[in-house]
């Protein structure tokens, strides 16, 4: 064994069994792959017990992962609530449009007020949910950015603490634990594996025993050579470390042989061998026994080295498997995160499209309402034009009827005047006929009337000359 420092680590599994149980339950609950090492490894009649513990860095990593998962669940829940609110708002808009299309002005005003209240309430709730969603996204980004650095720092701190405690505990146990050769043979090292380091409790005690007895495990070959050259008459030889093998001088009598044997334990609990007997056979038997024990120790050391190498290989394999699993989990997490981002972007695009469709529907409804109002206005204007035309036509008809009545009255009056004039003419003619009729009774009367008329005509024709002549006669010069 190249040294005893290989086994100087701390087994913290037995110091806190409650913490071990909690860590194990957390690991099992979150599907962590634990080291699957055999429970018992038989080497030289010793039992090897394997235990494991989960470091605080992995727990912090799982804590960050749990927080991130809970935030993602909250984000999905808030997103679904936003979709529900938007769906209800769209339903309210459709219902409002349906009711407004078949309602009069008063009902339309009331429906509009109710719709505005509902729309404001929905918009307020959607705004609150969006703020909450932004807060969750911000917290998730903070956890993703700060959680990894924090967990790596905690892992480094925990590893330093473990190394410090391992050195302290190894020093204390090396000073206080009782060691003896028989106990080292009966109790072989028990191995407990604590990720990311593995710990050998009893191998540490055994290494301390070898180091305290022979100085170092490297001095076993030197001890073998020295024991082969050992003789009872040889001077005391020190084999390094804190233990020595002393050969005392022979006693002169059998009493001294019976009472001269003494063995004392040194400060490390190792037996110091003295020259208790004068017989070379006894000393050679002891040497053979020690050599046999050293061979067993060497075989045990070789087996321990093989076990350590096998555990190293298995640990590397398990570590690679865990690293690969963590990489796969990280890849799956990144893929799920990308899918979540894509889903969020899709929902945002759908929300934007719905907003655009709602705006276009509002514009369409407003345009249709404007077109309908314009058509109604044009119809009203055409009706008013027709009514005005009918009124003018009626007035013209009334005027024509009035003119016709007046013409009839005037015609009647004219006819009456003509009749009256003809009546007067007839009266005059009849009167003249009455005057003329006596003059036309006989030829003499006719001639007389003719001559009278002729004279009257001449007299009328020469009336001016007659007047002049009369004036000349009447007015003298």
UniProtKB/Swiss-Prot annotation:
InterPro entries per UniProt: TEX28/TMCC
> What keywords were assigned to this record?
Coiled coil, Endoplasmic reticulum, Membrane, Phosphoprotein, Transmembrane, Transmembrane helix
Q: Which GO terms describe its molecular function?
A: 14-3-3 protein binding; identical protein binding
Topological type in the membrane: Multi-pass membrane protein
Q: Pfam families under this entry?
A: Tmemb_cc2 (PF10267)
State the residue spans of region: Disordered: 1-24, 234-280
Tell me the residues on which Phosphoserine occurs.
Answer: 46, 253
The organism sits in which domain of life?
Eukaryota
Task: Kindly list the places in or outside the cell where this protein is found, as annotated in its UniProt entry.
Answer: Endoplasmic reticulum membrane
Compositionally skewed regions (Polar residues) per UniProt: 258-280
Q: Any stretches that span the bilayer, and where are they?
A: 409-429, 450-470
Q: Which residues form a coiled coil?
A: 63-83, 112-149, 284-398
**Family assignment from sequence similarity:** Belongs to the TEX28 family.
How does this chain assemble?
May form homodimers and heterodimers with TMCC2 or TMCC3 via the coiled-coil domains. Interacts with ribosomal proteins RPL4 and RPS6.
What is the protein name for this chain? Transmembrane and coiled-coil domain protein 3
Q: What is the lineage of its organism?
A: Eukaryota, Metazoa, Chordata, Craniata, Vertebrata
């Amino acid at each position: 064994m190249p040294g005893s420092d290989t086994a100087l680590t701390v087994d913290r599994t037995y110091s806190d069994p409650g913490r071990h149980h909690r860590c194990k339950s957390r690991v099992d609950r979150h599907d962590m792959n634990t080291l699957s090492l055999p429970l018992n490894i038989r080497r030289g009649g010793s039992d090897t017990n394997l235990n494991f513990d989960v470091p605080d860095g992995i727990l912090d990593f799982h804590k960050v992962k749990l927080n991130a998962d809970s935030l993602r669940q909250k984000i999905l829940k808030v997103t679904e609530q936003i979709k529900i609110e938007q769906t209800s708002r769209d339903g309210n808009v459709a219902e409002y449009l349906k009711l407004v299309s078949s309602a009069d002005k008063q009902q339309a005003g009331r429906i509009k007020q109710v719709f505005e209240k509902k729309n404001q309430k929905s918009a307020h709730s959607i705004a609150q949910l969006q703020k909450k969603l932004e807060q969750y996204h911000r917290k998730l980004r903070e956890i993703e950015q700060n959680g990894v650095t924090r967990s790596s720092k905690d892992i480094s701190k925990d590893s330093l603490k473990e190394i410090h405690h391992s050195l302290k505990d190894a020093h204390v146990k090396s000073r206080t634990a009782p060691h003896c050769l028989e106990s080292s043979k009966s109790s072989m090292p028990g191995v407990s594996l604590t990720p990311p380091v593995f710990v050998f409790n009893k191998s540490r005690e055994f290494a301390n025993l070898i180091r305290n007895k022979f100085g170092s495990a490297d001095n076993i070959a030197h001890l073998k050579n020295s024991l082969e050259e050992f003789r009872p008459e040889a001077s005391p030889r020190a084999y390094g470390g804190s233990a020595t093998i002393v050969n005392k001088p022979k006693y002169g009598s059998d009493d001294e042989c019976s009472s001269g044997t003494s063995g004392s334990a040194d400060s490390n609990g190792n037996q110091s061998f003295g020259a208790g007997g004068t017989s070379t056979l006894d000393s050679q038997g002891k040497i053979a026994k020690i050599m046999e024990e050293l061979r067993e120790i060497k075989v045990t050391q070789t087996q321990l080295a093989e076990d350590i190498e096998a555990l190293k290989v298995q640990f590397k394999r398990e570590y690679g498997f865990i690293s690969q699993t963590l990489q796969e989990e990280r890849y799956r997490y990144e893929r799920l995160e990308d899918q979540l981002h894509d889903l969020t972007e899709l929902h945002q695009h759908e929300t934007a499209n719905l907003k655009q469709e709602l705006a276009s529907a509002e514009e369409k409804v407003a345009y249709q309402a404007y077109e309908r109002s314009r058509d109604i206005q044009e119809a009203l204007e055409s009706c008013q034009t027709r009514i005005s035309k009918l009124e003018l036509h009626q007035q013209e008809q009334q005027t024509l009827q009035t003119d016709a009545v007046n013409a009839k009255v005037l015609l009647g009056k004219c006819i009456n005047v003509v009749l009256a004039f003809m009546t007067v003419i007839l009266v005059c003619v009849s009167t003249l006929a009455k005057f003329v009729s006596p003059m036309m009774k006989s030829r003499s009367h006719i001639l007389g009337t003719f001559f009278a008329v002729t004279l009257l005509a001449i007299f009328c024709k020469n009336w001016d000359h007659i007047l002049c002549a009369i004036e000349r006669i009447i007015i003298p010069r």
